[in-house]
Structure formats: structure tokens, C-alpha cells
């Protein structure tokens, strides 16, 4: 509490950044867990040729809705391969739109992970400068003169590391998880696109049932 105002400002900024990072991390972990269940159900249903519900309330449902929308817009002159490519393209566009929303917050984690140590270093340098100033003012190199500036300098460094380390680890994990989720959805999209392109009657009955 008795630290220099500059060092104290650095500590406050790093503490707020750490709090924001943990908020993003917890929110992403919970959301990714929910989407992972949707991915598994979507991929399993697409593999087995089961009827999928086009619900706008979840990611898998929006992908299915995009696929059904492209399937309805059929052109008698197009081949099955062309129809499949068009249906898959519509579903991939829906997927990419949601993927961009899921990436929200990840750049902030990357920024904090790379910048927090340097922000903490600013506080460290300022605290050491205060220690040298105290030595010059008192003409004394005892521990009681040097310790306050060194202590606040080291504490600023520690807060920078506390903010940066979880941010870097979480960014790497969440980015990897997001890539895996996207690949799983793409696999389901390919299977669903194939079913929609070649098995018209099955999905026509499914649409009628809805």
C-alpha cells in the first residue's frame, strides 16, 4: 500500500488484467464443454444418417438449418457432387460464423500473456530506481533504505507473471480445443452433406415430420 504511485498503477492494471483473463477462461471452458457435447451428438447422428433438428439455439442446430436451407434450394440441372458441395459450403459458412464468435476473448489472453511480463518489468525498473534514489538521498545503503523499493519491484514482477502464465496456458489450450471442435464439426458436415445430396427422400420425410 505504500508503493510508489507508478508501481501501484502497474499492479492495479495487472490485477485487473488477470481478473479479466480468468473470467474469459472460465466462460470459455464452460462453453466449450457444452459445445463438445453438441459436436459429439452432431457427428454421431450425421454418421448414422439420423434426422437432425435444425434448432437456432445451439451451434449444431444452426449448422443443420443452413444445410437444410441449401438442400431445399435444389437445382435439377446440378449433379450430386455439385449439390453436395453447395450444401457443405452453406454449413461451413454457418460454422465459421460461430467459430468467430467463439474466438472472442482469445486475442486478449494472447495479449496479456505476451505483454504482462513487460508491464511488470516496468514496475520492477521503477521500484529499483526508487531504491537508488533513496540511497542517494540518505547516503545509506542499509537494508531498511533499499528494501522498500526492491520489495515493490519484485512484487510488480510477480504480479506480471501471475497474470501472464495462466493467460498463455489457457490461450494454447483453448485454441487447441477450438481447432478440435471445428474439425469434428467439419467431419460431421461432410457426412451430413453426403446424406443430404444422395438421399433426398429420407430428408424429405424428415422435413415433413418437422
Model regions: which residues?
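Transmembrane alpha-helix/interfacial motif
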Residues: 2-47, 55
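Residue-level signature of catalytic and energy-coupling elements of molecular machines
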Residues: 4, 22, 55, 64, ...
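Residue-level signal for the membrane-embedded core of alpha-helical transmembrane segments
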Residues: 10-13, 17-20, 116-119, 123-126, ...
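Alpha-helical transmembrane segments of multi-pass inner-membrane proteins
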Residues: 12-13, 147, 155, 159
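Transmembrane alpha-helical segments in integral membrane proteins
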Residues: 21-28, 163-174
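Predominantly long cytosolic amphipathic alpha-helical stalk/bundle segments
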Residues: 33-142, 169-210
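Hydrophobic alpha-helical transmembrane segments and adjacent short intramembrane/lumenal linkers
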Residues: 139, 143-153
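Hydrophobic alpha-helical transmembrane segments of polytopic membrane proteins
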Residues: 153-167
Amino acid at each position: 500500500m505504500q508503493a510508489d504511485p507508478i508501481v501501484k498503477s502497474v499492479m492495479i492494471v495487472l490485477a485487473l488484467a488477470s481478473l479479466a483473463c480468468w473470467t474469459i477462461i472460465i466462460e470459455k471452458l464452460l462453453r466449450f464443454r457444452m459445445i463438445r457435447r453438441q459436436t459429439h451428438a452432431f457427428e454421431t447422428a450425421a454418421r448414422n444418417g439420423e434426422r437432425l433438428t435444425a434448432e437456432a439455439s445451439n451451434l449444431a442446430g444452426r449448422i443443420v438449418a443452413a444445410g437444410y436451407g441449401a438442400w431445399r434450394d435444389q437445382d435439377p440441372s446440378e449433379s450430386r457432387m455439385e449439390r453436395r458441395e453447395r450444401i457443405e459450403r452453406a454449413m461451413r459458412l454457418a460454422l465459421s460464423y460461430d467459430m468467430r464468435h467463439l474466438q472472442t476473448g482469445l486475442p486478449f489472453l494472447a495479449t496479456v500473456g505476451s505483454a504482462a511480463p513487460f508491464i511488470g518489468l516496468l514496475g520492477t525498473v521503477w521500484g529499483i530506481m526508487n531504491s537508488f534514489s533513496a540511497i542517494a538521498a540518505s547516503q545509506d545503503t542499509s537494508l531498511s533504505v533499499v528494501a522498500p523499493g526492491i520489495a515493490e519491484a519484485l512484487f510488480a514482477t510477480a504480479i506480471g507473471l501471475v497474470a501472464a502464465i495462466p493467460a498463455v496456458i489457457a490461450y494454447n489450450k483453448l485454441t487447441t480445443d477450438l481447432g478440435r471442435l471445428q474439425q469434428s464439426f467439419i467431419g460431421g458436415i461432410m457426412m451430413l452433406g453426403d446424406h443430404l445430396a444422395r438421399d433426398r427422400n429420407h430428408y424429405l420425410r424428415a422435413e415433413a415430420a418437422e
